[in-house]
Amino acid sequence: MAIAQFTLWGVQCQWLIARCVLDSSLFAPYLSHGKVLFKGSSTVSCLTTLLADTPMRICGRITKNGMKRGKAEGQGAHFLLYEHGEIRNVDSCLEQTLQAMGPGDLFVTGANALDAFGHAALLIGSSGGGGYGTCMPFLYTEGIRTLILTSVMKLIPGDLTRLNPQISRKKCDFSYGMSCSLAPIPGEVLTEPQALESYAHVSARVFAKGGFSGAEASVAIQIEGERKEVEKVLNMVEQIKSLPTEPPVDEGSLAECTYPCAGCSQHRSCAYANKQTIFHSIKIS
């Protein structure tokens, strides 16, 4: 048996999860015989870039300025469908696409929060949940398998099933950026350990998190297994360390919103747009 430890930061963790999923046995059957619907996130965009050289458009994001959306819609897809070896933008026909999916098909998304009980959730900053709001009833009722790709850095304390009702975009009085609610995601969470264990015959454990001097949001991982399998993972880690240090998302969606923006009409409590009802003393640069 062999044991190895390594650290990956932020984007490298996203690349690792994407690479492991792409090469795993759990993903292959859907590529061959089913439909795979991807919802845009930085981690999922790593996966679609590796799969089909097609980065995705991201919508909401947390930046140094708070919870924001993209400044412009951009031309990239926020929802991509992979079927019969081809990938296409289904933003304009999302509901029809979901109506044609069922058991034997796969939905792949990221998450903004996960807990120790296996629950995951997305931040919702617009009325009805935007594109994910369209997806939710189909994910709960049509037997579509859902994979939730997210780093252990998204782990929060407590139980999301209890927290979700307490976080409300409409009850919030002040927010740096748009106030948000949480929407649950029904499905299977794949963080770094689960992704690694699907990629190679190893046991994987996260044993520390943190970072300094450019390595913020790092994760320390230990793997154990036969030498051949451990070195298989280390070879992949070496490749990941040479990949771009920014997530491969659609360039048109990189810029964050500034007041006024296309989403202002739906966003609530944003202090940058003077929508807060308390604390009117922030400095806007």
Predicted segment positions?
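Long, charge-rich intrinsically disordered regions
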Residues: 278-279
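Conserved phosphate- and dinucleotide-binding cores of soluble alpha/beta proteins
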Residues: 2-4, 8-17, 76-245, 249-271, ...
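N-terminal active-site beta-alpha-beta segment that forms phosphate/nucleotide-binding
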Residues: 2-84
